[in-house]
Amino acid sequence: MTYFVELSDNAEEHLKTHAKAGNKILLKRIYNIFEELKQHPKTGTGKPHELKYKKAGIWSRSIDDKHRMTYVIHDEIVTVLVISLWGHYEDK
């Protein structure tokens, strides 16, 4: 099964900010994770794990030491919605 990866408005802004910063290694890692999400959103690079308590249902994986990708998996519509690509969860 191949998932469709969709970016929230917030995640799109974060991606633009990363692109403007010019860190090609970080951008390559983000795009590689997008490709992994299409095939297996619960495993792969960046130690994916489901968050707990109030954030249950949201998944996270490390992009680098400073930034994490958070996303929601919608199995019923075969879609992964990326919520954030900046900071550590809600750090701004």
Predicted regions and their residues:
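PIN-domain endoribonuclease scaffold, especially VapC-family toxins
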Residues: 24-38
